[in-house]
């Protein structure tokens, strides 16, 4: 087959997946898969929080609006933390008041304590998130308290949110490995996830913060968590440090999880885990899901364009393999 013909076939197949076409059916080779997956876009918050150069507010707003226009149903917009700790998020109020806020899109914000929750409410936030850990060492270095103490702090936020009618999402970091203590017990992950859910978190996102997970360790962790909580209240949040993120997500899908966190252009990392590379790229997750025939309601091409936009502003290559590959076709 000639190169020109091969390239033409590649363009056709890629165009099918970019458009959300079902190139492949739900085959038994992959096991049971959800027919629809909800993507939670974390790029504007988790993706940008580590950038040393402050990203202009209008750029953040433009990025969020582009992602919303692409059909992403949940976009984590910003974080109501002290600018002393995360300077990049100092413009949280301006961001929340400037984005378009489409009626079919949720714009949750991170609120680590009651002060942050109150500030978020004053800025018009309609959903918030809290952030905990399954690693005692990570919890102490990240939020300067034990896991038990962090849960107590979150209770204030949960109580205030309940009174205000605000839904709360929970994050559990270091679900398979910790940069300080190594392996993390699946039983501990299950314990923390259940406590968050019992407190009132409608959804608990399980984060492989430093990206050391494999399908084997992710499966073992999920087996433990699924003994305590149904798959319908769980989400998977993977980093791609060792190139395992998509395989890990597929494993979670096969086990019944149907919510996936991802970051446009693979932006982000963790300010407390220096070796961790970016979150799994939204574009790459979409390409895999669409190729499996799973509905997302998201326009992949528009997400690619949003990723290229923010990467031009940041002056860095796009971290999405799909975005990079399609730019060469």
Tell me the role of every PLM-derived stretch.
Residues 2-329:
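Catalytic cores and adjacent flexible loops of soluble metabolic enzymes
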């Amino acid at each position: 087959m000639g190169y020109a013909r091969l390239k033409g076939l590649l363009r056709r197949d890629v165009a099918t997946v970019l458009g959300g076409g079902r190139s492949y059916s739900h085959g038994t080779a992959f096991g049971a898969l959800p027919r629809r997956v909800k993507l939670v876009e974390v790029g504007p918050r988790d993706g940008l929080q580590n950038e040393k150069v402050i990203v202009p507010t209008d750029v953040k707003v433009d990025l969020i609006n582009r992602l919303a226009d692409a059909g992403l149903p949940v976009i984590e917009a910003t974080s109501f933390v002290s600018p002393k700790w995360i300077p990049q998020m100092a413009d949280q109020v301006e961001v929340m008041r400037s984005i378009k806020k489409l009626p079919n899109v949720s714009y949750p914000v991170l609120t680590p304590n009651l002060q942050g929750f109150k500030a978020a409410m004053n800025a018009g936030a309609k959903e918030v998130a809290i952030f905990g850990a399954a690693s005692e060492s990570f919890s102490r270095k990240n939020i300067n308290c034990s896991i038990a103490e962090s849960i107590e702090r979150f209770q204030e936020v949960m109580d205030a949110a309940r009174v205000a009618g605000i839904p709360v999402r929970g994050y559990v970091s270091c679900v398979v490995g910790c940069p300080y203590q190594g392996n993390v017990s699946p039983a501990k992950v299950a314990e923390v996830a259940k406590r968050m859910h019992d407190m009132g978190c409608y959804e608990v996102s399980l984060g492989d913060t430093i990206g050391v997970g494999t399908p084997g360790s992710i499966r073992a962790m999920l087996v433990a968590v699924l003994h305590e909580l149904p798959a319908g209240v769980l989400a998977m949040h993977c980093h791609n440090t060792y190139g395992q993120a998509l395989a890990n997500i597929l494993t979670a899908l096969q086990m019944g999880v149907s919510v996936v966190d991802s970051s446009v252009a693979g932006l982000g990392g963790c300010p407390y885990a220096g070796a961790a590379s970016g979150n799994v790229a939204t574009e790459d997750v979409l390409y895999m899901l669409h190729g499996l025939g799973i509905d997302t309601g998201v326009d992949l091409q528009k997400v690619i364009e949003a990723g290229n936009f923010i990467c031009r502003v940041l002056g860095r290559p796009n971290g999405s393999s799909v975005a990079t590959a399609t730019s060469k076709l």
